Design a protein with these regions (language model features):
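Active-site and channel-lining beta-strand-loop segments
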Residues: 26, 175-190
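Short solvent-exposed loop/turn micro-motifs enriched in small/polar/acidic residues
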Residues: 19-21, 60, 170-173
Length: 190
């Protein structure tokens, strides 16, 4: 159970004693489990890009990098960052990963899921274009230019998704795009 990837979800800020007990439990587990999730903080984060409807009982995918409505899943695509990649190289990779993820977001007809899963997923088409290997990169692992590079790559992802959504293919624009997630295992493989 200690490695089950579970989190406790608070609707608001927990009292200090409750939070400290959670923190001590997290420390004692030596595994990073269980996670602590605040639904109110998630609602505030969702409101930041002004493309998503607030007020849902938010949760996340198992690694907690994507905020999801109840009965919703997202589409993750991964960009492998090499230490020698230039900003232009990475923007091209993000462009293609966004195309793949956007097209993948249309694959929602799973016969074994209730209709609400299909409805929620199609309404938002949440897309995670993640970067694996950022800590090995000569720029992204530093604080000097990394924020600008990340912002430029985010713009490529949003613009690419918008282009696909407005060209008559019948794909709705994603309500949220991009993420940086813990990809330690993946980055070791690639």
């Amino acid at each position: 159970r200690a490695l089950a990837n579970n989190s406790v979800a608070y609707k608001g800020k927990p009292e200090m004693g409750t939070f400290m007990r959670e923190w001590l439990s997290l420390y004692d587990s030596k595994s990073g489990e269980r996670g602590i999730f605040n639904r109110d903080a998630a609602d505030k984060q969702v409101a930041r890009n002004e493309r998503r409807e607030t007020g849902h009982m938010w949760g996340t995918n198992p690694c907690s990098e994507i905020i999801l409505r109840p009965y919703q899943f997202c589409n993750l695509s991964e960009v492998v960052v090499r230490d020698y990649d230039t900003l232009e190289d990475l923007k091209e990779k993000v462009h293609f990963a966004t195309i793949l993820g956007t097209l993948q977001s249309t694959l929602t007809d799973f016969k074994y899921l209730r209709k609400i899963w299909k409805t929620n997923t199609e309404e938002e088409r949440v897309l995670g274009v993640s970067l694996t290997g950022i800590m090995d990169h000569h720029v992204l692992s530093k604080n000097v230019y990394s924020a600008r590079w990340l912002e430029e790559m985010k713009r490529v992802a949003v613009d690419t998704n918008w282009d696909l959504a407005t060209n008559g293919r019948g794909i709705t624009q994603s309500a949220a795009i991009t993420c940086v997630k813990a990809s330690g295992t993946v980055s070791q493989l690639v």
